[in-house]
């Protein structure tokens, strides 16, 4: 086997031929690669001299000629050998070179431009535009794994050497967000979520107008970038599901008008503080409504979460009351009315304790608390009766030991009609599968909403109290919606169920009016003597009723007689006073 030896002169000649061949290949039109972006200080042109620093601290002058390898006909390393097996193994196998020609730049001067240590090579891609060459750093190949320290150092250098435009583009790339509704590019934070312009405008039109969208399919249409206009109903449903809401804004984005309102509120609070300090020195006849509003604003009831509201209402539920029913005694009109009125009178005592534990109720004045109870007591008793009777179709569970059906109610004149309405309401609750949490919310709504529009006075204080009641009602309504959403109902089902429950409250109000009229007729006929607290409640309801203001003179005479009667120890006002005295004594002890 013979081996051909080349002299030094022939080796230099071979080097020049290789360089000429490679440069000729790069000058062909089909190998021109357009620049991806403008050259910066990091990109070196062929007619310029640049110095690059590497982690090792060595420098390399690019003014010298760099060896270029781009021909696919040459191979300087056997592909079967692993990396690092020879001094030439640091190069790519040129049979598998990337589309752009590669320049290997040595980080320190070597004896020969062909021989480099593999840890000293950094690949760069050549870029050609109008005959001037530039270069950009290429991603390291799979087998090029610098140490972690060098990699972090190199990243810091590249970040510090990038221009301002590059850094801004990287920042905008990191801030790219997508629409929560259709997954398109988000244009900003609209109505509480990141959304695109199309979904923002669609939601704005939907909440401003009266658009009753109907899904032609099953209310489960796919809403994405391409199909968001196919179904308006499902698109609006998804807007609500992802959290879009009217008035939803980012906390860090407040317009000038909102900041102005905030400053006005702060100035108003400061004036309220001055007014309260002045009030101690010189008390006036009228209480400042601003001071009262500031106190109501800090009420604990308005800061409760939905779960806390439900827990408070469940804990406030009154205990079970048993009747004095004697199975051996047959029913007649007098015995049944005596049994029911006695049971109602004892339930009223527990109702007062329950109302005082409803969040926000004790923040009202004593007059307003009594007024609401006088307007709602029979509605509250009836909804409790209907709730207990849900599991007993065709019967009414007045107490655990008193279960009556429709036929038993016939012994009292006019009772069958009320029985039928109560049984129908219980069947409706049973069909809707009313939950205990929903029941306590409905009962609280009845208490707070019963007399909110019947305040006789129109002073600033009463108007402020009415506004506070509305805010507590909104809080309980939000709790109802939270319970429905928690049960897994869709948005449309939540709206439908909420409307159905609130419509039942109007039916309960109608039953209460019928029951109040029947009870008043029984009192006028002297069929049964009414107990003190129940009698006071009945008379108070008659006084607050609109029809009572234009009643006949005979009814006026009856009311005058009732008004001049001595106050009972079981009266509502005295019960409140006695309970407050007991609480103060317990606190003192």
UniProtKB/Swiss-Prot annotation:
DNA-binding region: 179-244
Chain segments carrying region Disordered: 251-279, 549-569
InterPro entries per record: Est_rcpt/est-rel_rcp, Estr_rcpt, Estr_rcpt_N, NHR-like_dom_sf, Nucl_hrmn_rcpt_lig-bd, Nuclear_hormone_rcpt_NR3, Nuclear_hrmn_rcpt, Oestrogen-typ_rcpt_final_C_dom
Keywords for this protein: DNA-binding, Lipid-binding, Metal-binding, Nucleus, Receptor, Steroid-binding, Transcription, Transcription regulation, Zinc, Zinc-finger
Any single Pfam family the record assigns to this protein: ESR1_C
Family matches, as PROSITE patterns: NR_LBD, NUCLEAR_REC_DBD_1, NUCLEAR_REC_DBD_2
Ranges annotated as NR C4-type zinc finger: 179-199, 215-239
Record region (Hinge): 245-304
Record-level GO BP terms: cellular response to estrogen stimulus; estrogen receptor signaling pathway; positive regulation of gene expression; regulation of transcription by RNA polymerase II
Residues in NR LBD domain copies: 305-541
Residue segments, region Transactivation AF-2: 305-589
Family (UniProt): Belongs to the nuclear hormone receptor family. NR3 subfamily.
Record text on subunit structure and interactions: Binds DNA as a homodimer. Can form a heterodimer with ER-beta.
Known role: The steroid hormones and their receptors are involved in the regulation of eukaryotic gene expression and affect cellular proliferation and differentiation in target tissues.
Protein name: Estrogen receptor
UniProt organism field: Gallus gallus
Protein encoded by which gene: ESR1
